[in-house]
Amino acid sequence: MHKHSLLSAFTWLPASRQRALRRNLIFIVTTLAVGLLSKAFAAGGTYVVDDGAINAPGECNVDAGYTRSPQRSTLSAACTSSALPNLQWGAAIEDDPEQTQLSPQLKGSLWAWQDAGVEIAWAAAAHIAVDRRHPFDGADLGVPLTWQAFETLRLNLNVGWSHAYDDGEQNQRLTWGTGLEYRLADSLTLLAERYGQQHGDQAWQAGPRLHLGKQVDVDLVVGRNLTGDRDRWLTTGATLRF
């Protein structure tokens, strides 16, 4: 009897790529299962370029992502309270072979022009290395802007500033990013972005986002550095909201 499976459609991939895809699928299924069992529904954080919106008052999201080559996993959560409807607060934890980093985050609404489809916010984050003697690793400030150009198309623009410790050296750089979201159907959105730092790294990412109802999204993202060794990567993520 011939055995069929989801991965049988990807037999043309090299064995190493098949193993990576299998791990990514297991990660997605596990994340969704944990989220559903805990009645938590999270929002997608696999992309770098932010939008100009914040959660509605009383709404929270939890994001999870796994990147292969270089290996990295992330988990984040954010909420907007009814008492402070213009402020979203949260935290992210990122784990890779070199370190584990905790990042408290704040994001606030600056201005919205609903008739023109424009939203502007401010965002701030601090980065703390939890397994290092000197834990403070840097901070980011940014201004994300979103323009709903059409019902199916959103454009995002980010400008900001980053302060980081690179191998003990302090660096301050301007940061930027551009992104677009094109909704093909109720269940599918295509995303692409390019982002970078002044005199630093630059990269792009793109991929589909599957909408499993109104509360669950799944991302499959490919990316590549545009500087240095031009690494490539594959990221899978799950977005759940409540």
Which residues make up each language-model segment?
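Cleavable N-terminal export/targeting peptides
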Residues: 1-47
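Transmembrane beta-barrel domains of Gram-negative outer membranes and organellar outer membranes
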Residues: 41-242
